Amino acid sequence: MGFFGRVTRTFVLRDGVTGRHVGALFFVAFFSVPIAGFVGVVQPFTLTEILRIPFDQQGSLTGNLLVMHELVNLSLIGLYGAASDKLGRRPLLAAAFLIVALGFCLFPLVSGQVALVMFRLIVACGVAGITSMLTAVANDYPAEVSRARLIAAVF
């Protein structure tokens, strides 16, 4: 029996949810977590080597970018949650990945601080959707008895 058969033995799932659904959830989670952290990892290189921003100015710019990113996340997570009840989780999750992909495609075009802010705004909009939809789906799939176990495995 393959991977998906073992998943359903490990977790008690809600009616209509199969091991394939859980496998897809793990697949999405596997890519979501690095996507959310990618910007922070490459930012020092971007500021130093691409934009040539002096080291003494990088701290304030990084702080401003992080605050802006978090404000976008906080303002959009509730909207994504409300929209997911109307439109469904899968279309919004796909749209969020496309928004992040758009931001990453624009990343090589960053030529100054304004472009960097725009890049971060686009990525923040997508990351807000990914994190809120991933959390919602992770809560939708398991039965109550194994909810904590599945959420711990996903995150």
Where are these regions (language model features)?
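Residue-level signature of mid-helix packing/kink "hotspots" within the transmembrane helices
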Residues: 69-78
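C-terminal ends and interior cores of transmembrane alpha-helices
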Residues: 98-111
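Hydrophobic core of transmembrane alpha-helices in multi-pass small-molecule transporters
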Residues: 30, 114-129
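Intracellular juxtamembrane helix-capping segments at the cytosolic ends
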Residues: 129-143
